[in-house]
Amino acid sequence: MSERRIIHVDMDYFFAQVEMRDNPKLKGKPVIVGGKASGRGVVSTASYEARQYGVHSAMPTAQAHKLCPNGYYVTPRFEAYKTASEKIMNIFKSYTEVVEPLSLDEAYLDITHLVRPDLPASRIAQYIRRDIYEATMLTSSAGVSYNKFLAKLASGMNKPNGLTVIDYRNVHDILMGLDIGDFPGVGKASKQKMHQEAIYTGQDLYNQSERDLIRLFGKRGHGLYNKARGIDHNPVKPTRIRKSVGTERTFATDMNDDEEILQKIWELSNKTAERLAKLQKSGKTVTVKIKTFKFESLSKQRSLRDPVRSETDIYNIAYDLYTELKNPETPIRLVGVTVGNLEKATYENMTIYDYI
């Protein structure tokens, strides 16, 4: 069996780039696409110029205004992004049927069957990026490797408009020198916990035994052990069907303050709504999950007559569910919000602002 060749393609600051393409006056400017600061809107995408001010996705737009008061704030145009995405996905499928979309602007492609001695995977990735630019006038970054984890890692290494290959010749050096926070799937809480264990780099992670990582991180420990070694056997799944969309947050310290927890639930509702929008889905169930300081998992779910998609609707239901779940005497270490029973969303007379 030939060695797998996987490409991960990720569009560069997708929503902001579409806006800059359609309005050349925005080129080179700090462009922030997102909800309005007057409400509780959040940033969906920030151009690289805006990121230099500390603006990033999922940040409250009001906070972005403080960091970048002279930025160009743009109300999202979902149909424009959807049109560009359809062209991009069609290009992927013109190369291979084994395409796993992750969102409107990101996908895995298994091109193992296309690779020949005179046609390496890196050249195929170059062709794909060229075709995307010619069809949309948008740049993309791609990572090429022998598994999904490394391909995704590679795609983020030379952004924007970059191409990176990770193979057996350079994988060890790349992983060993990687900051632990740059490993896909390692969030702020996990990073802080790793720092407490003197794990700062890929080398430090590599030096941990699998048993110790499982003791520290539960089931995730096995995956972290493999990631430090560049191991990922997961296939590219072209018929991937999502049954739910959700977001969880593990706190750096156990939390018992309702106001802080509800703020986190609002942020999770925003993130979940944004992911629903990218997947063009809405859902008829909302679930809130908490994990106590004793690692006890509790959850509440509500089934709905009409599907929900906006962050406000999701939050209002999540608020009620959390109120039913909470015990004032019990600190919690994790909270999650999930929308399930998904169906195709209807977008008539709507913009992506409904989801941000």
Swiss-Prot record:
- Looking at the UniProt record, the site noted as Substrate discrimination sits at 15
GO biological processes: DNA-templated DNA replication; error-prone translesion synthesis; SOS response
Q: What class of enzyme is it?
A: transferase
Classification via InterPro entries:
DNA/RNA_pol_sf, DNA_pol_Y-fam_lit_finger_sf, DNA_pol_Y-fam_little_finger, DNA_polymerase-Y, DNApol_IV, IMS_HHH_1, Rev_trsase/Diguanyl_cyclase, UmuC
> What is its quaternary makeup?
Monomer.
Give the species: Staphylococcus saprophyticus subsp. saprophyticus (strain ATCC 15305 / DSM 20229 / NCIMB 8711 / NCTC 7292 / S-41)
User: Using the chain's own numbering, where are the disulfide bonds?
Assistant: none
Family of this protein: Belongs to the DNA polymerase type-Y family.
User: What is catalyzed by this enzyme?
Assistant: DNA(n) + a 2'-deoxyribonucleoside 5'-triphosphate = DNA(n+1) + diphosphate
Q: What does this protein do?
A: Poorly processive, error-prone DNA polymerase involved in untargeted mutagenesis. Copies undamaged DNA at stalled replication forks, which arise in vivo from mismatched or misaligned primer ends. These misaligned primers can be extended by PolIV. Exhibits no 3'-5' exonuclease (proofreading) activity. May be involved in translesional synthesis, in conjunction with the beta clamp from PolIII.
> How is this protein named in the record?
DNA polymerase IV
Query: What's a single GO CC term here?
Result: cytosol
Cofactor(s) recorded for this entry are:
Mg(2+)
Gene Ontology MF terms: damaged DNA binding; DNA-directed DNA polymerase activity; magnesium ion binding
Q: Does the keyword S-adenosyl-L-methionine apply?
A: no
- Fetch the NCBIfam families from UniProt: PRK02406.1, PRK14133.1
Do the record's keywords include NAD?
no
